[in-house]
Amino acid sequence: MKELALGYLRQKAFSDRDKALMSLKLLTENAVGIGDHTTEDFYKNLDEALDLLVDAEDRIEVLGKYYGR
């Protein structure tokens, strides 16, 4: 049970990291859809993606520190 729980937490953290990286890449390299949104929405999306990335990286680090792998 412990391994299943830790596996879930690891996979969720890696998935969130990939999601954040993809969002940041889309926002910084392919921001063609900005015209549909305000710049405030754009900044909010950037902040949310970075927050998700930082959170995911922290979770990956903590899981590695306390549970290995």
Model-derived segments and spans:
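Extended, charge-rich alpha-helical interface modules
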Residues: 1-69
